């Protein structure tokens, strides 16, 4: 396992975040045992290379956003090597970035239920600015769907 790093004290490079988070996903069982580390890295690099994909690093988190056929909708995946409290700030700042770019809706798959308390904090911060965040348990029982619908009020002004 690669240790998370507080981005306020130590900023990791893009590659350090990406590879560290893949190592952690693999060691925590979130990447199946029959997938080698090399295959996992190749799959991620292939995804990032797609022309519909935009990657943004904020702190020690990398957000991989894929535009859906409706151009103002995005599906997002996070590769994280930052500590919990910073991850929530990074997510808020990424949401503000997407809102400014004209994205209206964001969805993400959340596998790790340890993120739920942090998502509730993020939800309260977004709702103060008129942006909705919902998390629903998937019927399959193997995770959660997170959905953000941006409001009119800018998230950029301090929340």
Regions found by a protein language model. Name each.
Residues 3, 52-53, 127-139:
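Short secondary-structure junctions
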């Amino acid at each position: 396992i690669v240790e998370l790093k507080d981005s306020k004290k130590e900023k990791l490079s893009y590659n350090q975040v990406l590879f560290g988070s893949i190592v952690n996903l693999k060691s925590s069982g979130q990447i199946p045992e029959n997938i080698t580390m090399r295959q996992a890295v190749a799959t991620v690099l292939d995804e990032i290379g797609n022309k519909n994909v935009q990657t943004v690093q904020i702190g020690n988190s990398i957000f991989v956003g894929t535009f859906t056929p409706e151009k103002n909708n995005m599906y997002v995946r996070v590769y994280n090597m930052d500590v919990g409290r910073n991850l929530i700030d990074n997510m808020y700042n990424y949401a503000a970035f997407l809102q400014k770019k004209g994205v209206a809706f964001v969805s993400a798959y959340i596998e790790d239920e340890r993120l739920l308390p942090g998502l509730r904090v993020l939800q309260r911060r977004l709702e103060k600015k008129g942006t909705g965040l919902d998390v629903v348990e998937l019927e399959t029982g193997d995770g959660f769907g997170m959905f953000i619908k941006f409001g009119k009020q800018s998230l950029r002004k301090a929340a």
